[in-house]
């Protein structure tokens, strides 16, 4: 079934979108926004209510209230999501003539769905099975890891598993039942930053991405941000 948020904050919408994209879902954002398309020339879209679609191949399409053709689109480049000044979605347009930047003043609805027609219940169940496996055998994450809570709420969204490592350090664990991409690393970083703000400024917080595998780019991002990858697969897989 589709995932949906109504009137989310920028932080909530950013967390929702990056998490859904990391799961290979199509993301739809409806809200009041402005957009800029740059390339051979610059084109600005004035404030208005529009629909943004972020597809699994990192194509971003923006539709207005009327007409068949999109108001703007970009594809081929990495998509970045930021909530520092409202929700901003940007695509550098690696395979197109222009880069697209969309900034939402308000998001009315955020939806994520499997446009390919895969059974979303099966995906969710597989992730739940991976979570159960980690909770049953926490040492799969790393020796000495102790889970304390699941779906712990933060300003960046709920953390899959909240716990402490062998040294007692607060640890956020992000679970992916398939090979994780850069969006998963970005989401994990959001959780870590949110926990640091919630606890205290000098708190030490770790982040561990648990998935069967990660892309090369994701591995680099994790290393650059001081995050950890732990290879764990859902039950029934031939992998660890």
Curated annotation (Swiss-Prot):
<dbReference type="GO" id="GO:0005737">
    <property type="term" value="C:cytoplasm"/>
</dbReference>
<dbReference type="InterPro" id="IPR002793">
    <property type="entry name" value="Endonuclease_NucS"/>
</dbReference>
<comment type="similarity">
    <text>Belongs to the NucS endonuclease family.</text>
</comment>
<keyword id="KW-0540">Nuclease</keyword>
<dbReference type="GO" id="GO:0003677">
    <property type="term" value="F:DNA binding"/>
</dbReference>
<dbReference type="GO" id="GO:0000014">
    <property type="term" value="F:single-stranded DNA endodeoxyribonuclease activity"/>
</dbReference>
<dbReference type="InterPro" id="IPR011856">
    <property type="entry name" value="tRNA_endonuc-like_dom_sf"/>
</dbReference>
<dbReference type="InterPro" id="IPR010916">
    <property type="entry name" value="TonB_box_CS"/>
</dbReference>
<dbReference type="InterPro" id="IPR048302">
    <property type="entry name" value="NucS_N"/>
</dbReference>
<dbReference type="InterPro" id="IPR048301">
    <property type="entry name" value="NucS_C"/>
</dbReference>
<dbReference type="InterPro" id="IPR049173">
    <property type="entry name" value="NucS_N_sf"/>
</dbReference>
<comment type="function">
    <text>Cleaves both 3' and 5' ssDNA extremities of branched DNA structures.</text>
</comment>
<keyword id="KW-0378">Hydrolase</keyword>
<keyword id="KW-0238">DNA-binding</keyword>
<protein>
    <recommendedName>
        <fullName>Endonuclease NucS 1</fullName>
        <ecNumber>3.1.-.-</ecNumber>
    </recommendedName>
</protein>
<dbReference type="Pfam" id="PF01939">
    <property type="entry name" value="NucS_C"/>
</dbReference>
<dbReference type="Pfam" id="PF21003">
    <property type="entry name" value="NucS_N"/>
</dbReference>
<keyword id="KW-0255">Endonuclease</keyword>
<keyword id="KW-0963">Cytoplasm</keyword>
